[in-house]
Every structure is written in structure tokens, then in C-alpha cells.
Amino acid sequence: MSGRGKGGKGLGKGGAKRHRKVLRDNIQGITKPAIRRLARRGGVKRISGLIYEETRTVLKNFLENVIRDSVTYTEHARRKTVTAMDVVYALKRQGRTLYGFGG
């Protein structure tokens, strides 16, 4: 291993570069019925038509913030895999403590 730490990462033959599909407009995958079901769970009876796009925007911003913080924790620990604890710590940092996932 010659002093490279855990996992022996470092020099070596680089593997083939994989093509990754560019993700676009996936927020539309949060469908109108899915938003309606979430609202029903929250006790909402009637929903304005303008709510759906606004909900998608708010959800996207929330997830971007949580994922950014989670990845920061992962990079700081020099890992490549985001763990449940990274997400728990990211949520706690934003004042939304989540119980039931360790820690």
C-alpha cells in the first residue's frame, strides 16, 4: 500500500471514462398527483393550480441545500459514498433534526 492510506487510492491505470446522461427537467417527475397526495397527508382539502410549480421549486431548493451539505460532509471525510449519517448531519445543520437513522 506504500503510505496511501485506506483503500490504496491514487496512481494506477485510469479506467475507461463512462458517459453520463445529462439530467434535465427531472423536477417534472414530481407529478401533480404526488404533490396532491403530500398535501392531503398534511390535511389540505383544495389546491390552487399555481401550487404545483411553486412546490417543485421549493422542493428543488431544499434538496439542493441538503445534498450540498451532505456532499461537503462526505468530502471532508475523504469518502466517495454519501451515507445516511451525512444526510442526518446536513439536516441537523439546517435546523431539521431527523431521528431514526443512527447517531
Curated annotation (Swiss-Prot):
<dbReference type="InterPro" id="IPR009072">
    <property type="entry name" value="Histone-fold"/>
</dbReference>
<keyword id="KW-0238">DNA-binding</keyword>
<feature type="DNA-binding region">
    <location>
        <begin position="17"/>
        <end position="21"/>
    </location>
</feature>
<dbReference type="InterPro" id="IPR035425">
    <property type="entry name" value="CENP-T/H4_C"/>
</dbReference>
<dbReference type="GO" id="GO:0005634">
    <property type="term" value="C:nucleus"/>
</dbReference>
<dbReference type="GO" id="GO:0000786">
    <property type="term" value="C:nucleosome"/>
</dbReference>
<feature type="compositionally biased region" description="Gly residues">
    <location>
        <begin position="1"/>
        <end position="14"/>
    </location>
</feature>
<keyword id="KW-0544">Nucleosome core</keyword>
<dbReference type="InterPro" id="IPR019809">
    <property type="entry name" value="Histone_H4_CS"/>
</dbReference>
<dbReference type="Pfam" id="PF15511">
    <property type="entry name" value="CENP-T_C"/>
</dbReference>
<protein>
    <recommendedName>
        <fullName>Histone H4</fullName>
    </recommendedName>
</protein>
<dbReference type="InterPro" id="IPR001951">
    <property type="entry name" value="Histone_H4"/>
</dbReference>
<keyword id="KW-0158">Chromosome</keyword>
<comment type="subunit">
    <text>The nucleosome is a histone octamer containing two molecules each of H2A, H2B, H3 and H4 assembled in one H3-H4 heterotetramer and two H2A-H2B heterodimers. The octamer wraps approximately 147 bp of DNA.</text>
</comment>
<comment type="function">
    <text>Core component of nucleosome. Nucleosomes wrap and compact DNA into chromatin, limiting DNA accessibility to the cellular machineries which require DNA as a template. Histones thereby play a central role in transcription regulation, DNA repair, DNA replication and chromosomal stability. DNA accessibility is regulated via a complex set of post-translational modifications of histones, also called histone code, and nucleosome remodeling.</text>
</comment>
<dbReference type="GO" id="GO:0003677">
    <property type="term" value="F:DNA binding"/>
</dbReference>
<dbReference type="GO" id="GO:0046982">
    <property type="term" value="F:protein heterodimerization activity"/>
</dbReference>
<keyword id="KW-0539">Nucleus</keyword>
<feature type="region of interest" description="Disordered">
    <location>
        <begin position="1"/>
        <end position="20"/>
    </location>
</feature>
<comment type="similarity">
    <text>Belongs to the histone H4 family.</text>
</comment>
<dbReference type="GO" id="GO:0030527">
    <property type="term" value="F:structural constituent of chromatin"/>
</dbReference>
